Amino acid sequence: MRQLIPTSAEVDDAALIEAYRLPPGRWLRCNFIASLDAAVTVNGVSAGLGSPGDRRIFHILRALADVVLVGHGTASAEGYRGIEADSAVGRLRTRLGRPATAPIAVVSRRASLTTDSGLVTDAVSPTVLITCAAADPVRRAALADAGVTVLVCGEDDVDLRLALDRLAELGHEQVLCEGGPALLHAALAAGVVDELDLSIAPALVGDGARLLPGALPDVARLELRQLLEEDGVLFTRYVLAPGTR
């Protein structure tokens, strides 16, 4: 892997960890992979665009995060499970002196997470459900009884700014958002995104979900802070420009 910006050099795992490590404090980092025509899935999942380098960065970002934020649709489509202590991410977290596991926080306006989901039954760190007051109270109560940490953030829709406040109150300040596109769009529209880590795969897909499903209220301006390359895949790290967040 070559780092192109700020300098050109080979990057090993230790250097890659330092390249993505954040200073203490609250931060919302969004991590996506997309094709050259901005498709984020092939046949409904992101794996068709992935690469070994993308997987390395995926592991590192999860290892550095306090919590992983994901929309319910993406969690279902991608078969999300909890982070296990003996997984590659769990072992890396341990080497970095962090707790071996971290919770998954699922965003669902309707509290659509089911009590028999692997995110509920198999989670080592209790899964967090971020929903709103309009969601079925019976479903919310059942999930809470099953061990899910239920956060009601907003009345008729999820208030992401409030959700991040609530996560911070639980000690989860550095948040890694893994999608999907609707959640990224909502977070950008709410002005809560600090960073976008976008892997650009050298492929053209032609259909499937796109990085953003629609127009934003205002154009989001970003500043390129880092660019790496491996096997033709570009790994970008953008920070939202002042005034955008």
What are these regions (language model features)?
Residues 1-245:
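Enzymes that bind and transform nitrogen-containing heteroaromatic metabolites
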